[in-house]
Amino acid sequence: MDLTGLDTSSTSNPRRTRTGRRAWAATVAAGVVAAGLLSGPAASARPAPDPSLTTMSITSPPGGANVRVLLFYGSAAGGEESPLVNAGIAAIERIGQTGPENQRFTVTSTGDASVFTNDKKLSRFNTIVFLTGGGDVLDPEQEAGLEAYMEAGGGFVGLHDAARAEPYSDWFTGLIGARPAAGQATVQRATVEVGDRVHPATRSLPPEWKRPDKWLNWVKNPSGDVHTVARVRESTYRPGAGANGWDHPVSWCRDYDGGRSFYTGMGGTVSSYDETDFREHLRGALLWTTRLVRADCKATITGNYKAERLTKPNQPGRNDQIGEPHGLVTAPDGRVFYIGRGGADASQPVVTDWNDPAVGKGRGEIHVYDPKTKEVTLAGALTVFGNKGGGDELTKVEEGLLGIELDPEFARNGWVYLHWTPHSGIDRDKRMAERRVSRFTLDHATDKLDLSSEKVLLKWPVQIHSCCHAGGGMAWDSKGNLYIATGDNNSSGFSGGYSGNNPEPNYKGVSFADARRTAGNTNNLNGKILRIHPEPDGTYTLPEGNLFTGKETDEGGGKTRGEIYVMGVRNPARISVDPETDILYAGWVGPDAGAPSATWGPAKYDTFAVITKASNRGWPYCMGNKQPYRDRNLPDPSKPLGWYDCDHPKNESPNNDGLVNLPPVTGSNIWYAPQGGGPDFPRDENGVPSYKQDEATYRLPWLKGGGQAAMNGPVYRYDDAGSSDVKWPAYWDGKWFVGDFYDADQPRNAVLMDPRTQGDGGLPVHSESLKKIVPVGNDGIKNLMGWTFGPDGALYVLDYGRGFFTSDARSALWRVTYTGGGPTPAADRLARGTQ
């Protein structure tokens, strides 16, 4: 094609056949050879072209307000173009002539690579599209021209087999982002996870996009080096040899060598270009690369984040920086308040003898980190029951200072809410204690708590003969309701690691191995998420919409507590509320069984849930997606009885003083076991899973457990009006952060939920690994103990340290900031001045 008259676009006859010096058809015939050249890293690659190969001077940035796109379809062999090329040309021409007037553009298509050595012609194009086959489609001088074009701020879009072009060029590999593995893909229908909900190429697409294409595998997964906007879900098709696993990028972008590059592995079929959604995908890519709109192509590039430790190791014999980490919250002015549970009290020894009045006495500490001074202040310390060291279930303890929240009007009133177990409230004879939620007042000038200002809002009994499961997290909604997470106050033993439902073990008449006494009991505040409305005088009222009113007359009345919003949770250490939607998010630790049992039920499942309404989450009757446990009871708890009915659970424990007939169980969104994420099994006619390991399928392939302890995180909300230069990008807006205390295969991810299904146990539609952003490993944040976003948009994280029931030199507060800069291109380099 003659490129002299560039104002003449090829849109007038979108279906006409073009003849170029290299034809697509010949490339397809030679595809096996081209693929072989790209089959692995051993292929000999050449570096970026020597700048001396060209003296071109490209206008910076290329193209102007009369936006033009150059579509190059050259290939390594000559001949007629293929129907695929013609379909792609027609689609891009159509895209350029639709949409708002200020987002339209003209298209010039050519198979003549000499255009890349003509700086005047090249300077007129805002973007170059490669609709090429494989092979060496550019000679060194032509590639040098393309490089000069990108360095001047040009745009590039690569489609499908463009990733096979220039197989010996490192620079072109960087431009594309990845190379296909050997072999030719066949057309298969699959699900594309559209994780980027803000990029113009993806924001209008469904989160789960089902479509047919030729799905390429990558020699080296580009995740972390590029910004992935969509990935293909391998469980929905047969990826074949060289599969990339759950993280299989299919479309991505990045700022590259001065310009903007977008690549999609889709577009390998003629029918792709007839799809409205696929054309919208290409349209968004072209709008960004032509500089018609700005977009962020940096958000998931892991090098754009900085993790820094904020606190120093404690001085010997002092907890001047941090206690045994157990939760954090940020104030509107950026201060970070974090608590120590009560272990590692440097001022006194661990006492485990119940005859000693000091048994379990510890200091629950509240520290404050000030980002302005970068100094830490010990705001106060409560005398808690919580310092018994490690050991077995009848020695160790998880009570202490468990949770912290700041009043919604904290900047004005200084009110701090603490969830804790005062040492003064223990009964050593009965081995019972009082748990409470108290309000204290902080002096803003000194960052000191006035311990005499305590107002006790809520208190309830807990058994302390046996460890464990205290919960602790708290969170506010926009209506001033306070959510309080409590554990089931139950031993992990006596049930083989399955349902905590052994009614027999007790101490002076109080069961410590039967979670039906607590989590499954409508009349007990343990194993719950409570919801109350604190009042200024230190009392509370009950909001409408809790699971019970406390006034139910069922089964004789007096068998419910109106504070209960959620029942049936085991150990919810962390909860959060999305400030935009008021939806509650929670995670809880499961039991200890290493494998499922056809006799007793599922293996240990750690769990995350999106909670949109008051509900029963199942413990100790059901876990995961409503997988039941086996009942047991007196006189012989070792003998299995019937399977629990998740839709009609009954509490028939002798330790129950609440309702027998319970609300139906709501399934969870995320659950995982040592074998993998989202284990599921075939079910019989009664809905009971087989629980046979060799019949398991894993619905969440991006995680698994082992040692596991779910650590719920926040939902990120991007502050568009904020001026912070460290805030995480808008890409993360609305994504839910889910993690685990451990850092191997366990989750440390941000997930995207479907609002239509999330309240009924719907699975995440997309998951993004954070392990290279919130760094794992001994020198990173190995033992995640809490995380939240501050008003600056940075992520604040607690690392528990490397021991248990203590702090050590690795116990620390960290901050993870974004350093990648804003969207591109710069506002003053937009092609038409405004977006």
Locate each region found by the language model:
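Secretory targeting and sorting signals
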Residues: 1-47
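Beta-propeller domain segments
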Residues: 296-302, 344-364, 390-394, 399-401, ...
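Extracellular ligand-binding/catalytic regions of CAZymes and related secreted enzymes
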Residues: 49-64, 94, 237, 242-249, ...
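A glycine-rich, often tryptophan-bearing local segment used as a flexible ligand/cofactor-contacting loop or short
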Residues: 130, 135-205
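Asp-box/WD-like beta-propeller blade repeats and closely related beta-sheet repeat scaffolds
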Residues: 431-475
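Residue-level detector of Asp-centered blade-edge/turn motifs that repeat once per structural unit
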Residues: 330-333, 406-412, 476-479, 578-581, ...
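Catalytic beta-strand/loop cores that center a nucleophilic Ser/Cys/Thr
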Residues: 54, 99, 178, 183-258
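Aromatic-Pro/Gly-enriched surface loop or interdomain linker
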Residues: 48-125
